[in-house]
């Protein structure tokens, strides 16, 4: 700061001290708000909130959740203790909570259910002496509190608010995020924290997929070692409801249920006897299984209105031998699936649930008229939209913050680049999600704006998915969850950069270049994924089929590997090829990405001390950076191995002793790589297990049946424990290669009367 600026700032501070303690806000209050409010007007003047403030209520009961949340969150986030005054207008500085039906008018909305939207509307008025939150109903009051909390900012040890006014309401009623616990399970206290975080972003629905992580009374054999009991599930349901979040049960059918059909007790319900992917849609016993499981979930989810009856990717409905006759009678595979949806959907409706389904292939547009209008279309299809609306069905907009990306969502895409000439092409369904050119946030916003802009459907909300297929930690999904749901609150006039930049201060508080952290994590994870090539593999059972058809003969799955290191000659340690030359582009990229990883680790460490909130989230982000770093170091260590072996070959004739010593150094690197890999994996596991129950074969008197999905090759399914994170390294035959090099080394040493060496590389072990 130059001298003139310092004098000017000093004068301003003195002037502020003489004029009622107002000062320019240390940062824009409006730019910390997510979702983006409908109407905002801030003055720019900021004042301190501290323990001298109180809270007063008007027509708000003592146990109202908005009041409780205000008091608890101010204390937890900012260390402010508000005195709770009696009802009525306060004296002195006070936060005033008011419920007054009809007090807040709402503007135009996409959702036609304006009654529901009015209940969520609020007005937040901030003045020097009072902050007043007025709402038509308790839900709106709660949302006004969340906005007020987001608007506060810590600066030099004090908490500031900015004067002004916000009038706000949602564009659509339901803002659902999908939490996928198919391959892991959060501890109960962690799940409550997650739900509380969702409520902070005005997320109103939490679709929770548990698969075997729920204690199904009707299907006890599928229950995994760690699972929520009915009591715990109801506890989560009630907790979510208190925060105006509906916990929505999620169950797949007829497809995506290997977690059920892999068990011997249910093999007779399969559509195909040699596939655990989907069940028969013409078997009454299969209907009973799904409905009984639904009943188990509903009994522990009292008060719920919705259920996700996920008909996702039911590719083979009508193609199984037992299905064909009924499909022909109805006039097609889509009509058979529509009949199944109708049959199950009607039963769910009788149980008081509105079912969301995937309106997609093999169903066709005409099949929509065969589905009951109480069914909710969970996937927007522009071509079918008018038919669905005319039929009386309501519509959700499906979008996703994560598909099959490794380690971290593609918030910022990495430009495509071919690193291997002989890598298997990406032809399978999950590898065709594209490059996500706009990044996850941009793609979500574009999808939502496109759908609502077409005005073809009776929209009721957005559904933001975060898939567990690739085994990511869902802590990495929050940027997408918060911004995707925010676009369901307001998308008109909102930009990708605006949503993203609002997320960081609202989620973390004070940060250091957090956007750079997310950019680097995105590109680091993308390089982690493409730095290994894809090859057919026999590490698991073959794949039964894909979206278009069942394979005549199941095809091998694919795994990632690296080009094999060359084996030295016994005679003179010469190498048949130079591994470094053949992989020059890969290794150059690895060196560059390691430099960027250094920047990433520095920023993460700085933010661990800088942020006000979400320290655990940063710990998880750091584990992602560590996994990327370990991969980069492995690649560069392989470069060093090749360099040492090349040097050994060049000195083998003139100085055998030096050549053997160089070979030993190369083998020592392999041992070090293994140890560093295991150390990183153990650190990652320990961090993730702070929130997760351990992934184990046995616990609580239950055993996990480890059998992979016959169609979907989800990496977390490859192993029982957390070693799926390093699975490709465990299967890369570097240990076998090192053993072969050791044999060559000892034979060469013997020829030159040099000592032998014994070693157990134990490459595939994750233990020290």
Short names for language-model regions:
Residues 63-64, 185-187, 213-217, 254-258, ...:
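Flexible loop/turn segments at secondary-structure boundaries
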């Amino acid at each position: 700061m130059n001298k003139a600026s310092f004098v000017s700032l000093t004068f301003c501070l003195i002037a502020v001290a003489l004029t009622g303690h107002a000062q320019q806000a240390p940062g824009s209050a409006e730019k910390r708000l997510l979702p983006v409010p409908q109407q905002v007007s801030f003055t720019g003047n900021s004042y301190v909130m501290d323990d001298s403030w109180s809270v007063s209520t008007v027509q708000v009961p003592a146990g109202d959740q908005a009041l409780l949340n205000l008091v608890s969150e101010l204390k937890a986030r900012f260390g402010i203790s508000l005195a709770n005054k009696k009802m009525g207008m306060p004296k002195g500085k006070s936060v005033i909570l008011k419920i007054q039906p009809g007090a807040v008018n709402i503007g135009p909305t996409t959702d036609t259910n304006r009654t529901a939207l009015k209940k969520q509307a609020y007005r937040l008025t901030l003045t020097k002496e009072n902050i007043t939150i007025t709402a038509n109903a308790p839900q709106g009051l709660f949302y006004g509190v969340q906005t007020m909390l987001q608007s506060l900012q810590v600066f030099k040890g004090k908490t500031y608010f900015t004067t002004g006014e916000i009038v706000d309401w949602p564009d659509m009623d339901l803002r659902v995020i999908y939490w996928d616990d198919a391959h892991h399970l959060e501890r109960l206290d962690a799940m409550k924290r997650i739900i509380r975080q969702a409520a902070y972003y005005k997320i109103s629905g939490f679709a929770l997929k548990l698969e075997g992580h729920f204690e199904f009374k009707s299907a006890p054999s599928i229950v995994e070692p760690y699972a929520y009991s009915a009591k715990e599930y109801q506890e989560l349901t009630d907790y979510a409801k208190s925060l105006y979040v509906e916990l929505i049960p999620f169950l797949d059918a007829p497809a995506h249920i290997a977690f059920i059909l892999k068990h011997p007790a249910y093999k007779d319900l399969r559509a195909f006897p040699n596939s655990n992917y989907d069940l028969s849609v013409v078997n009454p016993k299969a209907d009973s299984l799904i409905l009984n499981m639904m009943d188990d979930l509903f009994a522990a989810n009292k008060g719920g209105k919705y259920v996700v009856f996920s008909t996702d990717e039911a590719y083979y409905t009508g193609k199984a031998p037992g299905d064909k006759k009924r499909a022909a009678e109805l006039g097609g595979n889509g009509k058979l699936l529509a009949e199944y949806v109708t049959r199950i959907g009607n039963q769910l409706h009788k149980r008081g649930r509105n079912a969301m389904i995937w309106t997609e292939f093999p169903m066709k547009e005409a099949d929509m008229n065969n589905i009951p209008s109480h069914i909710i279309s969970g996937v927007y299809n522009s071509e079918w939209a008018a038919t669905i609306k005319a039929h009386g069905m309501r519509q959700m907009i499906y979008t996703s913050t994560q598909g099959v990306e490794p380690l971290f969502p593609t918030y910022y895409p990495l430009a495509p680049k071919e690193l291997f000439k002989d890598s298997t092409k990406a032809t399978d369904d999950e590898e065709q999600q594209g490059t996500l050119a706009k990044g996850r946030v941009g793609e979500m916003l574009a999808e939502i704006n496109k759908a609502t802009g077409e005005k073809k459907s009776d929209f009721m909300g957005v559904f933001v998915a975060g898939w567990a297929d690739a085994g990511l930690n869902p802590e990495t999904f929050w940027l997408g969850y918060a911004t995707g749901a925010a676009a369901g609150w307001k998308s008109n006039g909102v930009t990708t950069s605006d949503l993203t930049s609002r997320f960081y201060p609202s989620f973390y508080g004070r940060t250091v270049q957090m956007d750079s952290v997310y950019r680097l994590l995105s590109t680091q994870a993308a390089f982690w994924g493409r730095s290994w090539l894809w090859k057919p593999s026999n590490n698991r059972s073959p794949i039964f089929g894909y979206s278009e058809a069942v394979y005549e003969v199941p095809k091998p799955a694919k795994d990632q590997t690296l080009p094999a290191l060359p084996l030295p000659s016994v005679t003179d340690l010469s190498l048949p090829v130079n591994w470094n030359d053949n992989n020059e582009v890969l290794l150059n990229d690895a060196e560059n990405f390691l430099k960027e990883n250094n920047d990433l680790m520095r920023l993460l460490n700085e933010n661990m001390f800088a942020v006000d909130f979400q320290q655990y989230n940063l710990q998880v982000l750091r584990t992602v950076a560590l996994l990327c770093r370990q991969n980069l170091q492995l690649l560069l260590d392989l470069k060093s191995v090749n360099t040492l072996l090349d040097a050994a070959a060049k000195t083998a004739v003139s100085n055998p002793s030096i050549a053997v010593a160089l070979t030993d150094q190369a083998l020592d690197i392999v041992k070090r790589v293994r140890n560093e890999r295991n150390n990183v994996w153990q650190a990652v596991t320990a961090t993730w297990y702070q929130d997760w129950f351990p992934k184990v074969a046995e616990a609580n008197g239950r055993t996990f049946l480890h059998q992979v999905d016959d169609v979907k090759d989800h990496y977390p399914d490859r192993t029982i424990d957390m070693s799926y994170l390093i699975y490709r390294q465990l299967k890369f035959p570097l240990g076998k290669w090192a053993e072969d090099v050791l044999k060559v080394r000892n034979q060469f040493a013997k020829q030159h009367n040099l000592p032998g060496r014994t070693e157990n590389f134990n490459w595939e072990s994750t233990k020290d």
